[in-house]
């Protein structure tokens, strides 16, 4: 791939990169959908494994792209569970109380230089994750200045709202455009 932009998406449902393509203009854009069995069954005993599978795949892909295409600027994004995957993959350390052997090692610090932006839509809050025994999402310090976290008003997954409908409105409430503009401005 020629130097350009690469979008790594961790999402709970099929995503379209059409809006992103219009934002990067003449630059080349590649899209990679993280390969993991996304689910909204947070109470399932298999749920933690699905998230770990996503972290492993996203981290491997980001690191591989950084090595094989060092001039390419990557954007990491996700919605809901995908936002959790994207957030966890940026962590500088394995969360306390998580067995180190059960999860992928954090990405090498130099990989952060290849990630232009991280956009998280409806990332589950610490309170929400805690209900299921999951650690809070801790964006690594090298990624914090390039991360945009968006939570819709009333969203009960990422915020303190009480509207289950709000969590499904990102595609129509303007926040996808806001995230795309943020990412494009960093490329």
From Swiss-Prot:
GO terms for cellular component: cytoplasm; extracellular region; plasma membrane. One of its GO terms (biological process) is lipid catabolic process. Keywords: Cell membrane, Cell wall, Cytoplasm, Disulfide bond, Hydrolase, Membrane, Secreted, Serine esterase. SMART domains: Cutinase. It is found in: Cytoplasm; Cell membrane; Secreted, Cell wall. The keyword Cytoplasm applies. InterPro entries: AB_hydrolase_fold, Cutinase/axe. The active site is at 80 (nucleophile), 155, 167 (proton donor/acceptor). One of its GO terms (molecular function) is lipase activity. Its main location: cytoplasm. Disulfide bonds join 15-69, 151-158. It comes from the Bacteria. A single nucleotide (T) insertion is observed in the Rv3724/cut5 gene. Cut5 is expressed as Rv3724a/cut5a and Rv3724b/cut5b in H37Rv strain. Belongs to the cutinase family. This is Probable carboxylesterase Culp7.
């Amino acid at each position: 791939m020629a130097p350009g932009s690469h979008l790594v998406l961790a999402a709970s449902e099929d995503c379209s990169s059409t809006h992103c393509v219009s934002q990067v203009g003449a630059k080349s854009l590649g899209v990679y959908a993280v390969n993991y069995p996304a689910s909204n069954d947070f109470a399932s005993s298999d749920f933690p494994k699905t998230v770990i599978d996503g972290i492993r795949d996203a981290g491997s892909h980001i690191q591989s792209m950084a090595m094989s295409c060092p001039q390419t600027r990557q954007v990491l994004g996700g919605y809901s569970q995908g936002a959790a995957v994207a957030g966890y993959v940026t962590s500088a350390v394995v969360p306390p109380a998580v067995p180190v052997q059960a999860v992928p090692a954090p990405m090498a610090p130099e990989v952060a230089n290849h990630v232009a932006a991280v956009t998280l839509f409806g990332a589950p809050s610490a309170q929400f994750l805690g209900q299921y025994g999951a650690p809070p999402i801790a964006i690594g310090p090298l990624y914090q200045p390039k991360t945009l976290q968006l939570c819709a008003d009333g969203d009960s997954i990422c915020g303190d709202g009480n509207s289950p409908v709000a969590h499904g409105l990102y595609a129509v409430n303007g926040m996808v455009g806001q995230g795309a503009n943020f990412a494009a401005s960093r490329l």
